[in-house]
Amino acid sequence: MSKNFIVLDVEGYSTCKPYNIGYIVGNKSGEILSGKSFALMPAVWDNIQYKIKTMNVDGLASAHEMAHNNIKEILCTDNEKYTKVFDNHKFFGEFLTDITKYDIKRVWAYNCTFDKGALTRLFTEEQNTIVNNLVTFCDIIPAILYTKLLNKEYIEWCKKNGYLTAKGNVQTKAEVVYRYLTGNLEFVEEHTGLADCKIEYEILLNAMKETKSPRRTPCQAWKIIQKFCECEGIDIPALDNK
């Protein structure tokens, strides 16, 4: 199997086509062979419309703020941070070219169900078939969960630093995991495709250093951690509130 793989991150509402897609081509040694960030202009308006329609929906405030900042940056700057494409077929062409050029067999993403779903909405049926015949989508969450997070140290660290959900579950989002792995409690995820890819790549490399075959099937990390706590007698609020 090819030693190269893609780490991909998309930005956009879960019911819309993504307005920003970033990905890097790398390998287990930490070498980044390519990095790209695309602003998909046809999808920008779709996401703006969705934001307007759901302004008063509970639970979407942070998503709205993130979309507002990202789209504002895309529309108001001419810097080289994004490659603006006005035809989704152009992105598909570049993505397919890199898959072929670097002999990619696996595409990794943090919570890959979301990212793969976004690509499915973006691509035509034929394009989806082509991509799915060439690569397997893999989830970074189980890879890092079973190598670095499913232990008392991580759970106690989350409790100490307040990284629990409103229901008391241990958080496993990329920003929190990256803070844990690096010791940098001030780190803030940028929430743009290429920037997030870079930290997710580092997270994946941490998992790959621990095992030759990291787990890659999507899972409910919070539930697995909760079950681990029950078995190990670790006290967390989620267990107290049953």
Model-assigned labels for residue ranges:
Residues 240-242:
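Acidic catalytic cores of enzymes that act on phosphate-bearing nucleotides/polynucleotides
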Residues 102-112, 117-118, 159-238:
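Acidic, Mg2+-coordinating catalytic module of metal-dependent nucleases/exonucleases
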Residues 47-49, 53-72, 76, 141-197:
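Active-site-proximal helix-loop-helix substrate-binding element of RNase H-like nuclease domains
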Residues 38-41, 132-149:
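A short, structured active-site edge motif that brings together acidic residues
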Residues 78-82, 126-131, 184-190:
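Short, polar/flexible loop-turn hinges at active-site or ligand-entry regions and domain interfaces
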Residues 2-120:
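Conserved non-catalytic scaffold segment of RNase H-like nuclease domains
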Residues 12-14, 142, 199:
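Short, glycine/acidic-enriched loop or turn micro-motifs at the edges of active sites
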Residues 113-137:
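Substrate-recognition/cap helix-loop segment adjacent to the acidic, metal-dependent catalytic center
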